[in-house]
Amino acid sequence: MLRWLTAGESHGPALVAVLEGLPAGVEITTTQIGDALARRRLGYGRGARMSFERDEVRLLGGVRHGLTQGGPIAVEIGNTEWPKWETVMAADPVDPAALTGARGAPLTRPRPGHADLIGMTKYGFDEARPVLERASARETASRVALGRVAAAFLEQAAGVRLVSHVVAIGPVSAPDDADLPTPDDVAALDADPIRCFDAATSAAMVAEIDDAQKAGDTLGGVVEVLAYGLPPGLGSYVQSDRRLDGRLAGVLMGIQAIKGVEVGDGFRTAARRGSAAHDEIERATDGRVRRRTNRAGGVEGGMTNGEVLRVRAAMKPISTVPRALDTIDTATGDAAKAIHQRSDVCAVAPAAVVAEAMVALVLAQALLEKVGGDSVAESARNLTSYLEAIPEQQR
């Protein structure tokens, strides 16, 4: 079974991630992982941290000479800012006198919409520093690193490729009939300041972010992930926890600030009658069985149906609002303004990259459940055997 785990704090020495269960023989390098992490730093409206932060990637285990070895893969992402935080974030006890100053000051004015206050309550902290350090979206760098490894397996074992893009920033949305990007469009998307596939919409999104920044505010939006080349039958209908759409929704909702997920046309289908909500089946001119439309987003009954997988995630505005929302000071109980940590105005573009990584991990997990394999070559052979066994009338 493919599984993953991450550890580390936002301003700690490093983030660490482990991916267990991936077959041997997958081609992957630190450069490829570093490139994926660089994509996570893209996007108009990012904070100052993105301009000087660098992700120092080291593969600590599971990869030799550019090939996975079949054992757990361990990735370390070093924090170039660590020397500035070494005392504040030290693992061992430090002299309280050494914590005087801005970085070491207790954070007792929790931010509305963030994990701060509830995290303090749940874990018994008297300030928010331990909470925000782990709850920070910086942690997603770990998942992007692992997602890049999973994406390499998907492409090499099954020819599956993914792409993500931004479809809305605040009230500005791409047209419903806008063209969908393909994996061949990744470079063009990454060159766009918003990672939006529609140029006119992208320009309007930039203007919306500028307005929010001038107002001392933040913005959310909607991202979409597409997976091309998926075989039918990944996932299952026999138990709720094996349904692929439920698993995708779970990992996407697990991304910081994501508050909603839809597969295919999702919430829009709720306003339609059944005759206009489902994808009719036909035999195409090439002889293959296909759906005339893809309102289901490539998933029916909790399983891939051979069409393009299409999932969206809605991100709320960042909770670190520059103009500071009302809160309380937990040290005194008095009314106060929330703390303002260095933050972004809009982080929807990087959220798309994180969502892409999480979709890759779940799809790799589902593919391995279906075809198995201790090497990527064996997984590919097993997939070919499965596809060849599908009755001709159902292909």
From Swiss-Prot:
<dbReference type="GO" id="GO:0005829">
    <property type="term" value="C:cytosol"/>
</dbReference>
<keyword id="KW-0285">Flavoprotein</keyword>
<feature type="binding site">
    <location>
        <position position="342"/>
    </location>
    <ligand>
        <name>FMN</name>
    </ligand>
</feature>
<feature type="binding site">
    <location>
        <begin position="316"/>
        <end position="320"/>
    </location>
    <ligand>
        <name>FMN</name>
    </ligand>
</feature>
<dbReference type="InterPro" id="IPR035904">
    <property type="entry name" value="Chorismate_synth_AroC_sf"/>
</dbReference>
<protein>
    <recommendedName>
        <fullName>Chorismate synthase</fullName>
        <ecNumber>4.2.3.5</ecNumber>
    </recommendedName>
</protein>
<feature type="binding site">
    <location>
        <position position="40"/>
    </location>
    <ligand>
        <name>NADP(+)</name>
    </ligand>
</feature>
<keyword id="KW-0521">NADP</keyword>
<comment type="pathway">
    <text>Metabolic intermediate biosynthesis; chorismate biosynthesis; chorismate from D-erythrose 4-phosphate and phosphoenolpyruvate: step 7/7.</text>
</comment>
<dbReference type="GO" id="GO:0009423">
    <property type="term" value="P:chorismate biosynthetic process"/>
</dbReference>
<feature type="binding site">
    <location>
        <position position="46"/>
    </location>
    <ligand>
        <name>NADP(+)</name>
    </ligand>
</feature>
<feature type="binding site">
    <location>
        <position position="301"/>
    </location>
    <ligand>
        <name>FMN</name>
    </ligand>
</feature>
<keyword id="KW-0288">FMN</keyword>
<comment type="function">
    <text>This reaction introduces a second double bond into the aromatic ring system.</text>
</comment>
<keyword id="KW-0057">Aromatic amino acid biosynthesis</keyword>
<dbReference type="GO" id="GO:0010181">
    <property type="term" value="F:FMN binding"/>
</dbReference>
<dbReference type="GO" id="GO:0009073">
    <property type="term" value="P:aromatic amino acid family biosynthetic process"/>
</dbReference>
<dbReference type="Pfam" id="PF01264">
    <property type="entry name" value="Chorismate_synt"/>
</dbReference>
<keyword id="KW-0274">FAD</keyword>
<comment type="similarity">
    <text>Belongs to the chorismate synthase family.</text>
</comment>
<keyword id="KW-0456">Lyase</keyword>
<dbReference type="InterPro" id="IPR020541">
    <property type="entry name" value="Chorismate_synthase_CS"/>
</dbReference>
<dbReference type="GO" id="GO:0008652">
    <property type="term" value="P:amino acid biosynthetic process"/>
</dbReference>
<comment type="subunit">
    <text>Homotetramer.</text>
</comment>
<dbReference type="GO" id="GO:0004107">
    <property type="term" value="F:chorismate synthase activity"/>
</dbReference>
<feature type="binding site">
    <location>
        <begin position="134"/>
        <end position="136"/>
    </location>
    <ligand>
        <name>FMN</name>
    </ligand>
</feature>
<dbReference type="InterPro" id="IPR000453">
    <property type="entry name" value="Chorismate_synth"/>
</dbReference>
<keyword id="KW-0028">Amino-acid biosynthesis</keyword>
<feature type="binding site">
    <location>
        <begin position="256"/>
        <end position="257"/>
    </location>
    <ligand>
        <name>FMN</name>
    </ligand>
</feature>
